[in-house]
Amino acid sequence: MATPHIRAYRGKRIHMIGIGGSSMSGLAQMLLAQGYRLTGSDNLETYATRGLRDMGVPVTIGHCAENVHGAELVIYTVAILPDNPERVEAERLGLPTLERATLLGQLMEGSPVAIGVCGTHGKTSTTSMLAQALVVAGADPTVHIGGSLDFIGGSTRVGAGRVFLTEACEFNASFLHLRPTVAVVTNIDEDHLDFYHDIDDIQDAFRRFLKLLPKEGHAVGNGDDPRVTALLQELDCHTVTFGMGVCCDWRPVNLTYDARGCASFDASRHGKTLGHVTLRVGGFFHVYNALAAVACAWTQNADIEKVCEALSQFEGAHRRFERTGEIDGVQLYHDYGHNPAEMRNVLSVAKLQPHNRLWAVMQPHTYSRVKRLFQDYLTCTRDADITLVTDIYAAREKDPGDIKAIQLVEGMRANGLTAVHTPTFDDTEDYLRKHWQPGDLVLTMGCGNINQLNDQMNEHERAKEAGPM
């Protein structure tokens, strides 16, 4: 069966399996804005499913065959396995189906400027920064982010300008379904090792993505990452680099940090200062993200002073070192980081915040990732005073039986860390409430559902304050 095209289904019922996902919920909003009729399903009720329901989309919680009855097109993500009852029923009925990344590529078609932000780390933050910068600079872009940005009111924005900006995710090589005219590469590192064989395989996927660029296009890459620069040298299109190195096109000059780790710097191109940035989000990695946004905006002839002003107002994306509340004088934060390098980076920022003791609550994500990066996990929370480790979040995988969270805890202890296995959210909350002290800071980390622990603790606190009914 030929791949269906979304444009052929305007006015027809489209069903989205996994509609509550960060990307899928945004794409649903984009389709709604363009007049498409939608239904959806997800296995969890979340703010995303509730929000879509408020917009008029019938969303069913739980997957069953009946959900696709009456649909004329079914959209799914790679996280929805072939044995999902809705996918099975769609196939039985002969319904055309479309994978999420293919849909995104189709929605980008026809945009004069199609920007894809890729990289192992920093995609969402960089895309969010660039979105805010382009809006402030007057580009009126259409935006698709794999997270939520208050500045645009969520994960998507439908604009009337020439620019379509999206995250370009390397998992399952899904970014190869896109047709970018501009690509931003934040970095290339080991991840998604359930799909890729090794780092060379990962780098080759990025190579194939960059080679989708037209000759008149632009590749904007991290000039301090040798894997990125090696790929840039292979391209026929225009290339722009950013970073700390003296050979980078865009560099931060007069770089300083405040007590919370927030950077201030002049954005300099080939030695000429074109704007000043004072970030409100902490971490050296955000200097790279901001420079990437500046360099990319420059390729579109944006007013760099306005771009820098926008970056100076950037408050961060949801689930990126996001403060979620305070209980008993304890500050609660959450971060999406799930790779050891990301956890290490965000803990370096958390350590700079005022606190008594720093708690790291880690939800390891997928058995394959834990197995391949096991040694890195054992020391990545060294900046924390205490590490709590929940059971591994399986996501799309089945338990192979040979890797458990307790093995991480034992390895951390062997490396001198104070670590405790708290298998469930209830176990974790109980341990925290028994042992935390006023002035402590708790940071939950992971890209699974660990953010729901923060919600759970806040809900329990509100119920306690309300008293018996």
Language model regions located:
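N-terminal leader/targeting and accessory segments in enzymes
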Residues: 1-103, 226, 248, 282, ...
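Nucleotide phosphate-binding/pyrophosphate-handling subdomain across enzymes
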Residues: 3-15, 23, 27-34, 111, ...
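Beta-strand->loop->alpha-helix junctions that form or flank phosphate-binding loops
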Residues: 41-42, 60-63, 98-105, 144-147, ...
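C-terminal helical cap/extension that packs against the catalytic core
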Residues: 378-438
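Structural beta-sheet core signal
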Residues: 16, 40, 143, 183, ...
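Conserved hydrophobic helix-helix packing surfaces used for dimerization/oligomerization
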Residues: 14-16, 74, 115, 141, ...
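Short internal beta-strands
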Residues: 36-43, 219-223, 359-363, 384-394
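Phosphate-binding loop of NTP-binding sites
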Residues: 5-7, 30-33, 53, 67, ...
